[in-house]
Amino acid sequence: MCALLSNVSSSQALRPLTDVRPIATLPFDCKYRLIDFPLSSLSNAHVDNVFMTFNEGETQSVFDHLGSGSEWGLDGFNSRYFVYIQQDFDRLKEQGKAYFAQHLNFLKKSKAPYTVLLGSKFICNVDLNAVLKIHKLAGKEITTVYKKVSPTLAAEYDTILRFDEEGKMSNCYMNQLENPQEKEALCLNLFIVNTDWLIDFIQEMQNAGEIASIAHLLRARMKDYDVNSYEYTGYMSNITDIKSFYDANMVMLEPQNFTSLLYSSQPVHTKIKNEVPTYFSKDSNVVNSQLGSGCIIEGEVKDSLISRGSKVLKGAQVESALIFTSSKVKNDAVVKYAIIDKNAVIENGVQIIGTAEKPVVIPKGSVVTEDVIEL
């Protein structure tokens, strides 16, 4: 198999976290990034050629995290990843040029009989070998992966699948859904398709002048084809806004969720950093929390996730918070129900307090010298 990995999803509701990075490189559970999950699913299925698309101006954190791609087996002689900018394809379309030429060239050169299409907005750990097996048995051109969830977990433009008595599938956007059921089949924007069929489909869409997004076209047009489906039953989070992102991290403090997502038979790979272990002073007090390596903890930490290289100094209190890489909570500061982005500093005695429904977000690199209390 080869893969097309789309990372162009965006949401104003995730700002300011996405002011400096794409959704794909949002931090998760102390040491991971969201893109680690689709890349790990691909790696575990021995997919060694990956075509990635990102938005213009959002690739710095991507290259910093991916490096050579070695952690996901993408640094070999015949194993590699390619990064393209979505807006370049949009401009080619505006100029009347062949805007899917790079995609078609990639698919033809891969010589892979099957192609995986996926994104990085959904946090899940899918066994693509199992999906491929079902795809082959079904004998259809397309297999899509879904999870049954409460409609409240779907964003307005997420795709909901419906099945009639004969198993034929139809689909619509969440905001078009009539009479929502207790559980709906949420499309995880993950497909396995026959590569020859995909090449013909892309060529047809290009000739018709359709939008320059294969993932969008496939979701919009799959009702016109005989599509097979695969139900994913593992852990899943849908990242749509600050609240959903905060909750997705916080539920990792529950052992069942942590084990299901990160320590199943499908390992999750991430960028390796050889750092010293975290230091806990004799006065520190840590309860029900997770911490990355290289931290210094002298204060109190409760129900929180502290990323690599962060500091919680003497007298500081951190509760129900996400502290990103290399941030510092100084002496006697209080941080509750908050997300402290990378390299931020909370000065001595400052209080950062939000609520579980609306956590306070401190932007990357901020130095906070005054209280921020939003109750």
Regions flagged by a language model, labelled:
Residues 1-250, 362:
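Unchanged
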Residues 1-7, 196, 205-375:
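Left-handed beta-helix
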